Every structure is written in structure tokens, then in C-alpha cells.
Swiss-Prot record:
Keywords: Amino-acid biosynthesis, Aromatic amino acid biosynthesis, Lyase, Pyridoxal phosphate, Tryptophan biosynthesis
Enzyme class: lyase
Cofactor(s) needed: pyridoxal 5'-phosphate
Matching CDD domains: Trp-synth_B
GO cellular component: cytoplasm
GO molecular function: tryptophan synthase activity
Superkingdom, taxonomy of origin: Bacteria
Known EC number: 4.2.1.20
UniProt gene name: trpB
Name listed for the protein in its UniProt record: Tryptophan synthase beta chain
InterPro entries reported in the protein's UniProt record: Trp_synth_b_CS, Trp_synth_beta, Trp_synth_beta/beta-like, TrpB-like_PALP, TrpB-like_PALP_sf
Amino acid sequence: MTYQAPDENGFYGKFGGRFVPETLMKAVIELDEAYRASKTDSAFQKELNYYLKEYVGRETPLYFAEQLTAHAGGAKIYLKREDLNHTGAHKINNTIGQALLARQMGKHKVVAETGAGQHGVATATVAALFNMECTIFMGEEDVKRQSLNVFRMELLGAKVVSVKAGSRTLKDAVNEALRFWVANVEDTHYIMGSVLGPHPFPEIVRDYQSVIGIEARKQHMEKEGKLPEAIVACVGGGSNAMGLFYPFVDDSSVQMHGVEAAGHGLETEFHAATISKGEIGILHGAMMDVLQDENGQILEAFSISAGLDYPGIGPEHSFFRDLGRAEYHSVTDDEAVEAFQLLCRTEGIIPALESSHAISYAVKLASKMRPEESMVVCLSGRGDKDVNQLKERLEEQAND
């Protein structure tokens, strides 16, 4: 059976949809129409591919991690090197596409939210490239954690607004960015950073990120003469995972594994494991699994990795879970830090803390598989942004 989702109302099973105030409905429908038109517009697609190749540096390598494989002692581990993109992560695959879409709609201003700062940097980058005015909302906590990325965004010409409401993290930044969009909808496009939000955002972001899986599928066939037995990616909102998963969705022999942030542990309140611990609710314009208390109040998500501490998850991931098409697991802060150090030492690659969650689970999974089997892990970003945070953490532990 060929997988087809979302339906015409933007639902993935019972998840997704379009729950937005009347003030945004026109903009969301306009975006939907522009997006559908762009898919069959050969000039648009040609320009998108030009920038992905010449500016972003695609395609990215599928790298056989020989030493990591030997360490795990099982299946071959291939890394899809999204860390080698311009700006150092997968985020730019999506921002390039959406900036071109904004231009097509005649909008010369963009707004975005950011957690780790990677999406903010990728948005500020394309805004500079296409000469657009750019406003980025970032939770005050994340501004502190990722001060280097704040400076990067400002260097690129963006205005960074520190959000002091609520938990002062990603969820609150999204709230403020949506408010800003409502007030400036005529000339501003909202560049959603993950497979979240009202329809058509989850579909748009999935499609722009699918370049990851399309390339990985082709590259793995060239290297191994077969499809991988498993594919693994970290999941916050879930765009790098969806980008890897979607092109494999009809290949039933390929197991799909999403890895959430377990923070201090699932038994504590300090985690971001939405699929494991969430319940269905509406957040930021879509029906999805959400971390919430018994009164339906959104809980704060927690992770060492600023890019994973979102209290919801892309609706299509929840749908994959319900279909049994993908499995979701979680990895603690400590396990992610261990995997971060392991990849540095075995392969000479400094991964983002987000991606380190995927590496941690991949090593466990590979050890249970046979040597003739193989897997693809999405190395979603590089870890330069995390080195300082890690240094402080390890120094604290040494002093305890």
C-alpha cells in the first residue's frame, strides 16, 4: 500500500489539522496555495535545487563510520552528514525553500522561532541571501545557553527578540513568533522550523527536508546494493527525522527509529519524551502528542539539548507510531554526552548534542544486529555550538 498523508484537511490520521485564529486563516490558505503551485513550477524547483547545490553544498556524504561500527560490534553504521551543510545543520534545507516561497508570495519580511539557535541562524542566513528583513524569537533561557548563535544571527542582520514569558524556552518563542505573524501577516512569512504547526507547515517542512532521505537512499544503494535494515534520527519537533524517514516510508523492510530526549530520566519531570509520555492535545495550531498535566496545561520540556526541548512532536510522527511504521525511543542527557564524546574519539567528528541522542541509540541498536546488516543515522548537526556547554558540564562533574 502506498502511503499518502496528510489528507485534504491536513490530518495524519487523528493528528495535525489546522487550528488557527481567523486572523491567520487567510495567510495559511495563501501559503498552502503557493506551496502547491511551487511543486509543479519548474523554474521554482530549478532555483531551489541551484541554491541547495551551490549555496548549501548538497549532496552531503553518506559516511561509513568504521571505528564507531567496530566499537558497537554489529551492523555497519553509516552517518548522513547533515553537519556538513552550510550553517552546520539540516535546518537550512527548509529555510531556503520557505524563503523562496515567501518571495514568490511577495513577502519581503520573515519571522521565525528558534531553540538551539540553529533554525534562527539558518533563517537569518537565507534572509541575508535574499535581502529580507528578519526577526527571530528566542526564549531567554536559550539566549543564555546559546549566546554564540545569538551573535551569529545579529551578524547576519537579524533582530533577535528574547522571550521572557512562560518557561522562556522554545514553546514560548513559538507563541511570540505566531503573535508577531498575526500582527504583520500582510508582508511577513513565518518560517516554521520543524514539522509542526497548522497545515500545510508539517507537510512543507517534511518535503523540504526529504532531500536527506532521498540522497541517503540512493547513496546506500550505491554503497551496499540494498536498502539499510534500519534508519535512526533524533526527534524534537522531528524535522530531520521526518526528512530521513519519509522517502523510506513504503519500504517495509526498513525499520525507522526516532530518538527523543529523556533528559534526567523518564521517571522524573525533567525530560522531553513526548511520544513516550505525552497525551493528545492541541499545540501551536495542530493536534499532536503533548506533554501536559492532568488539567491539560502544557508542561515544560527539558533536555541538555536546546533543540530537543519542545513539549510536542510533529503530528506525522504520532501517526507513524500509531501505524506501527516507526518506533520511538529515548536517551538521557548522560547517554547523549557519552555518545558525543564517543563520536569525537572514534571518528574525529564533533556532533551536535541533538544528534548525539541518535548516535547513542544507534550504537545500542547496531550491537544487536548482524555484521552484514547496515543502518543510516542522521547526523543532523555539528557540535561547535555545544562545546562550551559540555566543557562546563564536565568541569562541574570533575569538581563534584
